[in-house]
């Protein structure tokens, strides 16, 4: 993995912009929903690449990702106090996701679907989402 983090970030963002994929995830096209989808993709990315890169590189990527996320939130127009509160919440949600996704390969389809459903708060096509992430291991 080359230390060109912008390409990784942009590719992950592009996953959330793909309308066909987005329709699978949720009925609503909101910033919050897209952010959750982005965080899930990033969690899978880190899970899949953590053993292929050194800790320093992975930490740099993590820092870059959340710096870019913060900049995006600022561009929307939120103030400093709101941004700090939102970023703390997003990082906590992300770490919870990352923790649960770590054992993804050992989960049943029902358990995988429950995990996804917990974060996206949807009953729509949850099994398809689990299959989506099973099939995207090498892509994400």
What are these model-derived regions, one by one?
Residues 1-140:
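Surface/interface-facing alpha-helical segments and adjacent flexible terminal/loop regions used
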